[in-house]
């Protein structure tokens, strides 16, 4: 059996920094998800029920719509809240979303972006993507500050976010129970 030693100090330091960054991100994620760190590291999510809890389908009243109907709602709205998520990052659609926001602002619509701390691949991912698309920082509003604004929003447009908007988090016994969510279901549309 060979005995190996790492004699490269730079490699050891780099490894320690990567490990420390990983622990820091894990702590931030566990805090934002309202979970103990060990639960996050072990992959534990709730009590083992299905993601929807007892109900197998969506809750509430569902209304079929079309792109044309959504466009009309957006243009005639006074206030629109965009809710970006991991799907936005995967589609690399942050510039298109920012362009839509600019178009609506040009029609006098108040536009803001609801930022969940764990949306995307890591904490702060949505902030970085939207800043890259030149969305003004003042329009990026975090979870605690944006949730009271949803009832006054004419439209909440969810773009690639699901777990951070899942109302099952409000029910005990679901895998996402207790995780803070964006209250998109409280908007007018």
Predicted regions located by residue number:
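Conserved small/polar residues in nucleotide/adenosyl-binding loops
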Residues: 1-5
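Membrane-helix interfacial "entry" motifs
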Residues: 7-11
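Membrane-interfacial segments at transmembrane helix termini in multi-pass membrane proteins
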Residues: 13-77
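Structured cytosolic domains appended to multi-pass membrane proteins
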Residues: 56-174, 179-188
